[in-house]
Regions:
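Short, well-formed alpha-helical segments that are part of the catalytic scaffolds
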Residues: 7-30
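A conserved acidic beta->alpha catalytic loop
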Residues: 23, 35-45, 58, 82
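Conserved donor nucleotide-binding strand/loop of the catalytic core
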Residues: 43-68, 72
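Catalytic-site signature of metal-activated, phosphate-bearing donor transferases
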Residues: 64-70, 81, 88-208
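Short aromatic/hydrophobic "clamp" motif used to bind/position activated sugar donors
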Residues: 78
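Single-residue signature of alpha-solenoid repeat helices
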Residues: 175, 210-213, 251, 287
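Residue-level recognition of tetratricopeptide repeat
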Residues: 199, 240, 276, 317-320
Length: 321
């Protein structure tokens, strides 16, 4: 049977940490908890479960903290968990079975990440496979009978174990600070991180967060050539910002840019923004038309709810207006 190190990074998780560790304590062989600056009872709670509790100075970088946690692991595999995750009894048993039968050539195990009913998520599905269990020391294997080469792709196993993400508070302000600090340090956001930033802004960004994002987008546009996909995402956020800031001409400019980029067929998000614009200006028939376009004629690119749930609720609210 393989051995498993649990690695976690935490900060002010006193409300959920025991809930998480109680699920995992009978599965793992080692618990490593890295605290990034808790001011509540997180550290005393963690010390009830393990002596391996480490302090790590927060650097606005989750990867650095996770890498530090991984560096403390000693077991065959590393399981990475967040404090607001739980595993029910059926999936605990599945995890134990996996541990007893895991083949040594498996390097990553993916598990089903369940986000149903969460406080905040940018997933466009309630469940998705995510890598959760990692082989600590990787061996390299030669492949192909001639012109042989070393296999660089990991051997991945997709399990049916379900991990339930059940936060009790919204972390988006923390996330916005991290996105902003990353850009301030590097003047760069990778395409994947940029998209995640735009998704979080669309779901949860208030006027102040959108204004800061608009400044980042403006600065990035001077240094980086946006792909059409990234420019479309940015234009949605700029449109929302200008609508909330009551800057009609700039709002329309951003909205029209979407039509140009998407060759006349806009995305659901900009249809919802146009609907909200007309609704706020008292033109309810025009607003309804754009909600219908969002629901029936277009596809979302940032938030799947903008293509169904949001316009459906709005149309019910407007009724026969």
């Amino acid at each position: 049977m393989v051995s498993i190190s649990l690695c976690m990074i935490v900060k002010n998780e006193e409300a959920v940490l025991s809930r998480c560790l109680n699920c995992l304590s009978d599965i793992v062989d080692e618990i490593i908890i890295v605290d990034t600056g808790s001011t509540d009872q997180t550290i005393p709670i963690a010390k009830r479960y393990t002596k391996q509790v480490y302090n790590f100075t927060w650097q606005d970088d989750f990867s650095k903290a996770r890498n530090f946690a991984f560096s403390k692991a000693h077991c065959d595999y590393i399981y990475s968990a967040d404090a607001d995750e739980i595993i029910d009894s059926a999936n605990i048993e599945k995890f134990k079975t996996l541990k007893s039968m895991l083949l040594p050539e498996i390097e990553i195990v993916q598990m089903i990440y369940d986000e149903k009913g969460t406080v905040s998520t940018v997933l466009n599905a309630t469940q998705e496979l995510r890598p959760k269990l990692y082989k600590r020391v990787r061996s390299f294997t030669w492949i192909d009978p001639i012109h042989e080469t070393v296999r660089t792709d990991p051997v991945v196993y997709d399990s049916d174990i379900v991990i339930f993400h059940r936060p009790i508070e919204n972390h988006t302000n923390r996330d916005f600070r991290t996105f902003e600090a990353t850009y301030e340090k590097t003047h760069y956001l990778s395409p994947r991180i940029f998209t995640m930033y735009m998704k979080e802004l669309y779901r949860w960004g208030d006027l102040k967060a959108l204004e800061r994002a608009a400044n980042i987008i403006k600065d990035m546009s001077k240094k980086t050539e946006f792909s059409e996909a990234r420019l479309s995402e940015a234009s949605i956020i700029l449109a929302r910002y200008h609508r909330l800031a009551k800057n009609g001409p700039e709002f329309m400019k951003a909205a029209l840019r979407i039509f140009t980029l998407m060759q006349g067929t806009p995305c659901s998000e900009i249809c919802c923004e146009l609907a909200l614009y007309y609704e706020q200006h008292g033109d309810l028939p025009e607003a309804k038309l754009w909600y219908i376009n969002a629901k029936d004629e277009t596809e979302p690119i940032l938030d799947i709810k903008s293509g169904k749930e949001i316009p459906e609720k709005a149309l019910l609210r407007l009724g026969d207006a």
